[in-house]
Amino acid sequence: MSPLPSSGASGDLLADRRYAYAKGAFDEADFAAAADLARQALELAPHFAAGHALLGRALLALGAREEAVASLAAALALDPADPMGVRIDLAHCGALEPQAAITDSYVRALFDDYAPRFERHLVEGLNYRGPELIADALRRAASRRVRDVRFRRAFDLGCGTGLMARALAGTVAAIEGVDLSPRMLAQARKTRLYDALHEAELVAFLAGRAAGEADLVVAADVFVYLADLGDAFRESRRVLARGGFLAFTVQAHPGDGVVLGEDARYAHGEAYLRDLAAATGFTMVLFEPVSTREDRGAPVPGHLAVMERSV
């Protein structure tokens, strides 16, 4: 079940109060009370998208799939940009194709809300180490290619608060970061490690850059919010000079293709990644199983790859 919106405003004070009580009940796993209170809020404010989303999620938890889908669909119709991640819930219950589940608006809202506590929760709570793993992999990949590990210009896709730039300090002459979340970018700006920061979707950002402009593109736990990585790979190859690296981590699953996990992230199969790398003009320099973070104390399986633009 995707995260609930942190707040909701319907324009009706009493409806907002009922919604707050409903969200509190949901957070306490009292789904029957949450559904009842959400219905009360919607009686007062029928066009309250967050109220429909909360009702749908409570009904899903109660096993009332048909009613839940109707409520979730109503929420999506009222707010098609979907910052609440309703599409994810619809995909999980089979009412929407998983490839269409995650929107830019959802990712932006999620990380705007997450930004103030992002590093503390991710690093201390989840033992996150994606940037360090990528930095180490780049050193090993450079050694395999008998080349210097230093890079003249790097693009950090989904840069977040700047953890990747810290891990690459002293390795890149210039680094630019891109992220959907302005609040994450505000945190990254405080590091003073970036030569430029851009608020944009990553494929659109790459498409606006010159061919051969960079010699490193990094994406630490960012592709988990994209189902189809084809455009990201193709645009990364285009902006890379010959011999440049694309290094990234993703979540893994044992099968083929791409699946949407219960954690509202995509997991990519090894064969999918290898086939796509070859199809988009990359040579796989390094590919290995890793875990970049934990979930409830257990390692989350993933892949780490360093690919080279060889032609």
What does each model-identified segment do?
Residues 15-16, 49-50, 83-84, 183:
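Helix-start (N-cap) detector for alpha-helical repeat units in TPR-like alpha-solenoids
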Residues 207-217:
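A short acidic, Gly/Pro-enriched loop at the edge of an enzyme's catalytic core
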Residues 215-229:
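A short SAM/SAH-binding and catalytic strip from SAM-dependent methyltransferases
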Residues 230-242:
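A short glycine-rich, Lys/Arg-flanked "PGG" loop and its adjoining helix->strand segment in the class I
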Residues 243-251:
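Conserved beta-strand signature within the Rossmann-like core of class I S-adenosyl-L-methionine
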